[in-house]
Amino acid sequence: MTSFFNYHEYISSNDRAQTHHPNIYVEYGQSDTKLRRCVRVPRDYSVVGDEYPYFSTHFVGEEPGAYPSEEGPTYDSRSPLKDIISYQEYNDIVGTINGYMKRAFSPWQKCQFIETVLSFLTLWIFERLFASNNERVLAQLDEYIDQLNSKNADRFILINPRKNGFLSLDFLVMVGEPNI
């Protein structure tokens, strides 16, 4: 049996769909590696390309490429996140984070353009004297994630996208002893 992390790219018999992964954010062997699983929300390049990080708004395991199993839960795209968070809450979280990503990284924001011009005209002294829009928005994102985690620590922990280079949005969920 083969286990694919990008399960929606491969569909063949006797392959296991994997919508959650071991907790890579703690040292191997700690008890948290077995109790929490990492559910990854991938970036969606079909919306804005690579202009700025944009995370998929499809609920994990229910993307257009996900497949339901007729052979039982082992081969199903079902995610453990579905038991923990509602669709509305998921869309609110991902939508809010996507908003921060746009404000921080989109080159077409007025603030980005003005800061670039001022930096150029002052020979980049402006960047040394003042915090950039990017830094301010990412600080707001950090605060949002900290508030979200303190409010929902018993259900899930949202990992700051900075920790994985903005490649995915990672939720750590309690699953007990995973049967993998």
Swiss-Prot record:
Chief location: endoplasmic reticulum
Superkingdom per UniProt: Eukaryota
Pfam family name, one: Erf4
UniProt keywords, alphabetically: Endoplasmic reticulum, Membrane
Gene Ontology annotations for the cellular component aspect, listed alphabetically: endoplasmic reticulum membrane; endoplasmic reticulum palmitoyltransferase complex
Signal sequence extent: none
Location in or out of the cell: Endoplasmic reticulum membrane
Membrane topology: Peripheral membrane protein
UniProt GO BP: protein targeting to membrane
InterPro entries: Golgin_A_7/ERF4, Ras_palmitoyltransferase
Function statement: The ERF2-ERF4 complex is a palmitoyltransferase specific for Ras proteins. Palmitoylates RAS2, which is required for its proper plasma membrane localization.
PANTHER family xrefs: GOLGI AUTOANTIGEN, GOLGIN SUBFAMILY A, 7 (PTHR13254), GOLGIN SUBFAMILY A MEMBER 7_ERF4 DOMAIN-CONTAINING PROTEIN (PTHR13254:SF0)
Subunit structure comment from the entry: Interacts with ERF2.
The family this protein is said to belong to: Belongs to the ERF4 family.
The protein's name in its UniProt record: Ras modification protein ERF4
Species assigned in the record: Yarrowia lipolytica (strain CLIB 122 / E 150)
